[in-house]
Amino acid sequence: MRVMRVMRPRTLLLLLSGVLVLTETLAGSHSLRYFYTGVSRPGLGEPRFIAVGYVDDTQFVRFDSDAPNPREEPRVPWMEQEGPEYWDRNTRIYKDTAQIFRVDLNTLRGYYNQSETGSHNIQAMYGCDVGPDGRLLRGFWQFGYDGRDYIALNEELRSWTAADTAAQITKRKWEAAGAAETWRNYLEGECVEWLRRYLENGKDTLLRADPPKAHVTHHSISDREVTLRCWALGFYPEEISLTWQREGEDQTQDMELVETRPSGDGTFQKWAALVVPSGEEQRYTCRVQHEGLQEPLTLRWEPPQTSFLIMGIIVGLVLLVVALVAGAVIWRKKRSGEKGRIYTQAASSDSAQGSDVSLTVPKV
């Protein structure tokens, strides 16, 4: 079943007052992640609870307690093949979790001696990463309060790390309830199984590999230095490597590398920049590696061919002028020749009429 069935045992429904809530996943070859947020709003009713699920970088489900009819909803077409039982079951689980978060917010406020008037928030993240062979790489479960770490499941999935003395109270309760074992069983089992299922259902989208469109741009800083920026655009999945090299040697220590960003169309973009001496640009290359490429790309800044362009324009103009002049000369010669023939014909005609009176004169 789905992730949150782990919360079903009532012994685990008590976190601080003993409720067990959920947490994150880091990206591996493929990942399944759930993010929960609960926000108290004194004087405005029940806390708001929002849950979203991601496969890799694609949001595929969402629940919002403030919706007119709160239900888990699909966010991608390939999730619509799930039957009514799936959505009904998960909607019930989310509604239960919203109530757990409501209790947790009150309990944590007491742990930190906070007043009832302020707004507070809980964030939980959990999930699993699998490798290309479909086996578990890592599992995650983290819990935060008011933007700070609170408690997390350790990497071996057998013990907890508490961030402060208040979290130590929760840690002792969860250790007594065997919460770590329950979560380890889920992360190593059901989480991986559901991720495989989602990858199969959405394989046309999730398992595609769109290669990057890459190029290098040139930006002058001063007379002595320039910035070379290597761009990779329109690629999927998110994982990509951009490395500047100087005559084959990596320059990773000196280059500026931004985080991969969504392009807004389901693909990603990224760039890496390096400051180099002016005039030495051709000694530097950018190496691009991505799943969608059959082999890595090696790019170099290509200076615009301005001198050749200007020379071509000049030559073209000269040829045009020469052609115009030649045409004018030929035209003038042609005109002169035509006038000479007209004069000759006219003179011959006058002479013939004078000597031969028998020629018929045309009527006027």
UniProtKB/Swiss-Prot annotation:
GO terms for cellular component: external side of plasma membrane; extracellular space; lumenal side of endoplasmic reticulum membrane; MHC class I protein complex; phagocytic vesicle membrane. SMART domains: IGc1. Disulfide bonds join 128-191, 230-286. Residues 210-301 are annotated as: Alpha-3. Residues 212-298 form the Ig-like C1-type domain. Residues 28-117 are annotated as: Alpha-1. It is a single-pass type I membrane protein. GO terms for molecular function: peptide antigen binding; signaling receptor binding. CDD domains: IgC1_MHC_I_alpha3. Keywords: Disulfide bond, Glycoprotein, Immunity, Membrane, MHC I, Phosphoprotein, Signal, Transmembrane, Transmembrane helix. Its main location: membrane. Residues 332-364 are cytoplasmic. Residues 1-27 form the signal peptide. Glycans are attached at residue 113. Involved in the presentation of foreign antigens to the immune system. Belongs to the MHC class I family. Heterodimer of an alpha chain and a beta chain (beta-2-microglobulin). This is BOLA class I histocompatibility antigen, alpha chain BL3-7. It comes from Bos taurus (Bovine).
